[in-house]
Amino acid sequence: MAARLVVDAKCSYPAACNAVETLLWDPEATAALDSCVSALSAQGVELRGCKETRKRHPQMNAATGADWDTEYGALILSIRQVAGLDQALAHIARHGSRHTDVIVTQDPVAATRFLAEVDSACVFHNASNRFSDGYRFGLGAEVGISTDKLHARGPVGVEGLLTYRWVLYGHGQVTTDYGPGGRHYIHKDLPVDG
């Protein structure tokens, strides 16, 4: 599942603001890393790895400190090994854009913690970050994005004080499955407890 998600997240539209820029991996997930590297390489993605990642995949370029903070807008992806969820959360808190972050795991406890603790506008479990899109959320045409928590200026009414955080639980969905000849988005109001 990880390889399919990361290929969609990087290759379906690499210049998009919701394209993945950094892949973090746990040392217990070497098989998933290997399949991601293979799939991304087959798509022509330039991979830049940390020292630990390059020990496993010496063919990739060395990542620099700047890579962890770069929005490439191209077929380039940085890859970093992290020692567990705590280190992943710390990396995201320091280097993340606060736009969209994804965890790919079968561990529901880790997923729940990730979704609760990552301070991004959109946090997803087992789904491509390319789903982070106004149209896909049923908001109509997207006129802009914000990673700030309060974005209103000038006179502010109640609507101007509201912000949204999107949480998506998935089962391996990718955006390339949707569109002409494929699956369709369904936009409908859902009951909200509150």
Where are these regions (language model features)?
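Conserved C-terminal structural/oligomerization subdomain of aldehyde/semialdehyde dehydrogenase
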Residues: L5, T64-G194
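ALDH superfamily catalytic-core signature
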Residues: M1-A74, H125
